[in-house]
Amino acid sequence: MRTLGAMAVMLVVMGTAIFLPFLLRSRDILGGKTMTSHVISVVETSQLLVDNAVYNTMKRNLKKRGVLSPAQLLSFSKLPESTSGAISRAAEIMETSIQVMKREQSQFSTDALSADILATIANLSGCLPFMLPPRCPDTCLANKYRPITGVCNNRDHPRWGASNTALARWLPPVYEDGFSQPRGWNPNFLYHGFPLPPVREVTRHLIQVSNEAVTEDDQYSDFLPVWGQYIDHDIALTPQSTSTAAFWGGVDCQLTCENQNPCFPIQLPSNSSRTTACLPFYRSSAACGTGDQGALFGNLSAANPRQQMNGLTSFLDASTVYGSSPGVEKQLRNWSSSAGLLRVNTLHLDSGRAYLPFASAACAPEPGAPHANRTPCFLAGDGRASEVPALAAVHTLWLREHNRLATAFKAINTHWSANTAYQEARKVVGALHQIITMRDYIPKILGPDAFRQYVGPYEGYNPTVNPTVSNVFSTAAFRFGHATVHPLVRRLNTDFQDHTELPRLQLHDVFFRPWRLIQEGGLDPIVRGLLARPAKLQVQEQLMNEELTERLFVLSNVGTLDLASLNLQRGRDHGLPGYNEWREFCGLSRLDTGAELNKAIANRSMVNKIMELYKHADNIDVWLGGLAEKFLPGARTGPLFACIIGKQMKALRDGDRFWWENSHVFTDAQRQELEKHSLPRVICDNTGLTRVPVDAFRIGKFPQDFESCEEIPSMDLRLWRETFPQDDKCVFPEKVDNGNFVHCEESGKLVLVYSCFHGYKLQGQEQVTCTQNGWDSEPPVCKDVNECADLTHPPCHSSAKCKNTKGSFQCVCTDPYMLGEDEKTCIDSGRLPRASWVSIALGALLIGGLASLSWTVICRWTHADKKSTLLITERVTMESGFRKSQESGISPQKAEVQDAEQEPAYGSRVLLCE
């Protein structure tokens, strides 16, 4: 009995020893003390994982600064600006932190994690500032000009439509783990009993067509798809992951065919002729607080699956011209201009007209051009401006139009500040983007019936409408335009015929080649080709030409990309529900059988191929299903995409407080003038063309379908003249150091609203009002912001030193490190430091000097008892040659040669020891 008792006591002691630490740790975790420190440790570890992956990405890019691969060009085209990049990084740190904690679920009770812990993770990762609602300014200016970021367009929902916020979800996403893993992530995951077909197989069997087999559109010009691409770049950009390497393990996404976040490679069939088994693909960045970031917390997991971010404003606001962040806007403006102009290219002109300025990054080189002479990419409001010359041409048109308008406004209203002229021109350019898109472009895409059904007439601003671009619109529906891209770039002469000196080019010969525009004729030949040559017709069995499926972004023989497969994979990455779910969303019937599918597609051969690949109608990817539908009458889309595009366009219009038709934005007279304007008028005012079609999107023959520019209506800008009297007691300031001001009226009084340039902070009253005694307060001043003092969110990576500059900051590296492409992180350049080269040179000189000294000492010591002579042999030889020539009568040259046979090191100037 005593033995049993002793054993029981021992078991209790052992059990206590084993379980007490865990119980104590659990108590501390539940209490918050240990858990908080553990969370800090996890976030710090995750930050290292993410930053190391980003660092390795930039280091690889630095080593590959020659001809870029297609995957690198795609990453470059989707490179986020600094604010988007910071949010993407924060989201990835937060998501990685949650993944670490998920692996520890066996140790911790996930239900015990509180909202405080979530806030701690969000704050430490850097996500929290982007999740909090912003403060909306309460000045008269807030109703006069739209903010560059779109924030506070809707004052009740300040982030609706703003840049760097999540894309809207019209249906819940479908992820294989319920909150983050894409469709097709797990090879053994079945949908209705079948795996999803590889996207490359879908491309090969259903989408791809040879360049020669395309059918041309007999109604619409090549300007139609180019405008669609341009407008898409105004309202949506989904940044890719900031890293092209896996966060766990750091493997390069271009070198692996395994799914390791953010790598989600496109698998190739086993019989593919390519040397690799897959094409690289990088997942889109998650928006802060979504996906894995929310799944661990019971109160968020059901409502907060992974969302993707839109780096641009959702609004039709000409962000292609002005950017979607203060940093980009600062780069684009000409701050020395008193008329509020945009920057232009200082190196090149197009027959006296401006080009876009250059960005710091080099684009694809001209053949044979030395590395130092490579033409940089163009700098515009959107980073994709250099993708193709046609897109760059449209960007350039609007740069010129802004400067034309701003110059005219300043001449009409000489009292306007530079900022007022800039904002008024920006306001008009934004309105023209809205008019051309909604009046001239969208009705052609939807057809008249669908336009009336889904868009209808404007009935005023509706603050309950969310204008945020939806995920399905950006990732699927509006990508219908890829099926209308022609494989050729046509450049025409002044008679609108093929240019003898500028032959047609295949699309892959113009990707990221701005030198084609600058050195080969400028804008005019490109614009003529867009106006007078047809677009590709979207035919069901000719959906996408091989320039896009086999040669996308190809600059050399190093790899390729496939746009169709990218679109399908992106839809799966974003968790878009299938084709039938979206038909049901739009009030259309589900199509469950091949016979039912044929009613919507009207092509039995294509239906059979679809069912053979997907096995079940509910498995069909929404982009393919919408693309395959037969057109509605007078449209260029089928019923599903007409519904999605129509709903989105109505939301963009009705949910925009600054829509041009809203009563407070323009006067009645100004709206009438704006309605007169058109894309052909913009072309007339900003190119050398003298004849244009009345509708830039309709294909026509020259000259019968073209009108003289004198016949194309234009706006009367005198309607923007301000006539209100200025009180002598309230004189406008001539300038504001490091800032600007605009004026407006509030309760019948003149008000000046001040703002500072990006990088400066306002000190004093933002708004001053004119009273009977003059301005009611002193004007504020703009003080430099010391970004380097921000220790919570330092502007530079820890590898770099932050140096404050006026209005900005600079990240500085120590030799031999150099700044990476984010201009914030120091990357090993792979060369020796300059100091090392200096040390090597000094060392060589020192060794040489010591050797010479040693040689002299040795010579003198060894010949101390002999006659030591230092000979400069060249001189001695010449002297002996002259002596011998005198004695023997031979020439000095011959005597010199004879001596040379006897003298050591003939001709040397080295001092020798004899």
From Swiss-Prot:
Catalytic activity line of the entry: 2 iodide + H2O2 + 2 H(+) = diiodine + 2 H2O; [thyroglobulin]-L-tyrosine + iodide + H2O2 + H(+) = [thyroglobulin]-3-iodo-L-tyrosine + 2 H2O; [thyroglobulin]-3-iodo-L-tyrosine + iodide + H2O2 + H(+) = [thyroglobulin]-3,5-diiodo-L-tyrosine + 2 H2O; 2 [thyroglobulin]-3,5-diiodo-L-tyrosine + H2O2 = [thyroglobulin]-L-thyroxine + [thyroglobulin]-dehydroalanine + 2 H2O
Region (Disordered): 882-907
Keyword DNA repair attributed: no
Signal sequence segment: 1-31
Subcellular location: Membrane
Keyword Nuclease found: no
Cofactor binding remark: Binds 1 Ca(2+) ion per heterodimer. Binds 1 heme b (iron(II)-protoporphyrin IX) group covalently per heterodimer.
Glycosylation sites noted in the Swiss-Prot or TrEMBL record: 123, 271, 299, 334, 603
Pathways involved: Hormone biosynthesis; thyroid hormone biosynthesis
Residue ranges of domain Sushi in the record: 728-783
Gene Ontology, cellular component aspect: cell surface; extracellular space; membrane
Coiled-coil segments: none
Broad enzyme group: oxidoreductase
EC identifiers of the protein: 1.11.1.8
Topological domain spans for side Extracellular: 32-834
Gene Ontology terms, MF aspect: calcium ion binding; heme binding; iodide peroxidase activity; peroxidase activity
Keywords: Calcium, Disulfide bond, EGF-like domain, Glycoprotein, Heme, Hydrogen peroxide, Iron, Membrane, Metal-binding, Oxidoreductase, Peroxidase, Signal, Sushi, Thyroid hormones biosynthesis, Transmembrane, Transmembrane helix
Site (Transition state stabilizer): 384
Family label: Belongs to the peroxidase family. XPO subfamily.
Subunit details: Interacts with DUOX1, DUOX2 and CYBA.
Name of this protein: Thyroid peroxidase
Organism: Rattus norvegicus (Rat)
